């Protein structure tokens, strides 16, 4: 509400509705705004020219800053003076690269690149959560080898603490989660704490980095899933290693359920206690050796 935005939920889908506004004061992170009625003035405060376009209910396009031409030329440009736009919110540097990753074979505007170089240290003012939010979206884009090359050259990766090892691999693999792309680039999972990633994201990154050099094969992956490993993690690992066919196979894989429970052993007269767990582990090993074929009764007969 403070910035003139509300979220309406229609049929379960959220839509942001924002009034026209102008930025009266900025500090490189957030702005003090006032509400206005001039569409062009509202568009002037946008970051990129094509993000400043709007369309009415009759399909008429309002393009005050030649955004459509920039899109057709596959180039991202800031509205007006790029240095001014960046200094209003330094996160716009990362947004620039994120939107470049959405364009096939993008063109690089030299004035924009120079403005980013001159203001890159401003990224240190940006919260870790906002940095990861933008980087995660960028990692789901394309042309990432080129994108990260320019981020290196402009000092962006250094400013946000991102290493770019094996960046050329990103354009050769397909993945469903941005953490997979991040795992390709980093050698440890420490960045997950710096960027304040969610617990699930941290767990996935740690798993992928830890197992990065372990070549995954179908039997091993299926055994791990049957033993209780999160199937989504194994799918992500296969995707990171460029094993698309294996990843697709694991998506369809339905693990068999170990047929014996502790109460089955108690019913056979075994005393409760540590011996039950030891016996279950022994039966699980036998079940695995049978390629998970033995039935409950066949396993119980092994006791």
Where are these regions (language model features)?
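Catalytic cores of the polymerase beta-like nucleotidyltransferase superfamily
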Residues: 1-303
